[in-house]
């Protein structure tokens, strides 16, 4: 009889250990999912901030367009905010005048338009998002700027 009690005790301890390991594994999975959801939320918030900053840059473009730039390369490392950036409520943006073109996308061929690049960066440093748009403004300036190109820049770009 004593021997059976020892086996039952051992079996109960093994089952308790297995249940404890199962609970620890479930807790770890729940923590990982919580972290993933937090990162996703932060990324979406940063994307919203970058979109709002892009609109702020477009508004600045309508009121005070920049002069023609000499070296119109896109910012090399926009995630690091190196160079001249203008602050807005949701992030930072940079305006560049790319020059005049007669062959802008989605515009009547032959119409003179001035092309501008707006690069927008969200304020969140951990989940920073960078958006870049090219706008065309007709030479007659009777229309608002028209977005002709858009891209999201990743950290690897």
For the regions a protein language model found, what residue spans apply to each?
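Terminal alpha-helical segments
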Residues: 2-157
